[in-house]
Amino acid sequence: MIIIHSSKFVNAELEAEVGPIPPCMLPIGNKKMLELQVGNFRKYFPNEKIIVTLPKYYQLTINEQMVINQLAVSVQRVCDTISFAESMLHVLNIEIDCPTEQIRILQGNRLLNDIPTSDDCIATVDQSRQSDWYDRYQRQDNESRWLGYYCFSSKADLVKALALSTKSFPEAITHYRDSIAMSEVQPTDWYNCSHFRSYFDARSSITTQRSFNALIIKSGIVTKTSNDDIKIQAEIYWFSHLPPKLRRFTPQFIDSGRLQDGITTYYCLEFLPLLPLNELYVHGRNPIWFWRNTFDLIKDYFGHAASQEYLYALDATDMDECRDSLYCKKTLSRLKAYQKSSQIDLHSAIFYQGIKLGSIYDITQECIAKMLKLPKRPVIMHGDLCFSNMLFDTRGRRLKLIDPRGLDCHDNFSIFGDVSYDLAKLAHSVVGMYDFIIAGRFEIIASHEADHAEYIIHFDMDERLERIQAEFLQFRFVDGIEVIDIMPAVVLLFLSMLPLHADRPDRQQAMLINAFRLYKEYVHIHSVEHSSIDNQLVHSEQVYNNILES
């Protein structure tokens, strides 16, 4: 039997980052730490029962309950005010169906990738490991070397030792050793996520990137490369040409150049121990006021990015042509690529929740037309202003933006664009639930009617997330543009991203069906009369035909 002890909440400094959650729910690598912990245990002990302890009154979100169910682990509720020893005694007295099994215990704020397999052992570490300074300060000398993983061959002897220990786990170990000898083992691949510094050490070692990006984090510096050389050069251009007054919204740009192969372009930024908003949105428990404050900071960024003192160099940029490129040509060319790889029919009728929406092409045409009707708003455009590219500094109440686009409609290096695109990227994280798709927190539900098949996408939304989305939809980020006005662009974003996730067909399907959901909920029901967009539809059809013929 394996017990992951996570019945207390994270400490105050971590709670300020992610909200009041138990340590096993901390986000790492766009997953909950529990997912990594259980995955590692399954590698070594595939048939052992796994129990995770949680605070007695901690209410699981729908999303968290889904993770628990998928991992097939049992949950035991334990009062968060009792000691580690009392918690273990409580669990062992309840779990009466495994009287002779080995007991393996992992503290919930630890992540072990090489789990010891020996019996009756205590995992220990070298006292010189700097990330453990906090634990050495708080614990006794003997205990300070304990990593947080223990194995006991006798449940009966362990229960007896815990009962005699008077709330002290080290004392329980002493009593257990009176009966059974315990060895010390030293794992080499592990992380301690009990406090701020060590948690971010773990995060920097477990990075996430898509197939076309690569990140190296070392000595406080992030080095980024990519298979797409123009993409990296464009990001370098954006960082190096950003006006000084806007640089407070980004990490420090340190260096750029080519690697030793003389071919691969790279650039370096300072590494900031900050959480991206996507992980807070999917895995955190941050309250509504936190997100309201975050939206205020984003609005502040939009205000500075639209400052007229930065836009004097925009004379040569044709905003109409650039908007047409972003919303029309880009979407249609990406759809063409997706059509070729998937053999999907772009002209077949689509049904969502029993409503006929038209074809993918019809949806695309309408959304393009609606976006091209919006007023032009030139700004210094980030170009990929989604939650995963926004780091939040809780102490300084600042946003730090990463991974900009840096290209205009002609694929020339540029820092300029239209604010509607940045706002659409933001909405595709909040309302579009993009980060839930990337984290695998969705379900595709299929139904088959007499004349067609129908698919819907379901997200595990709780009341808190619904309130955040409601706040977002009502928030005025840019004067003269409502969030609902840019929802057609969000639909286009999901359609245009389909070929970029070719390595994950499940995500591609989710993004396509999610585009239908967004169109049905935020565009279809708000549609204006067709006569007002006929000219744009004709224009889009001409572009579409040109792309297909190319």
Please report, for each region that a protein language model flagged, where it lies by residue.
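Conserved beta-loop-beta/alpha segment of the NTase-like Rossmann-fold superfamily
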Residues: 59-136
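Active-site acidic catalytic loop and adjacent metal/ATP-binding pocket
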Residues: 365-417
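N-terminal nucleotide-binding beta1-loop-alpha1 segment
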Residues: 1-21, 25
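Conserved kinase catalytic-core helix
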Residues: 278-342, 353, 358-374, 381, ...
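ATP/Mg2+ or Mg2+-diphosphate-binding catalytic cores
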Residues: 458-550
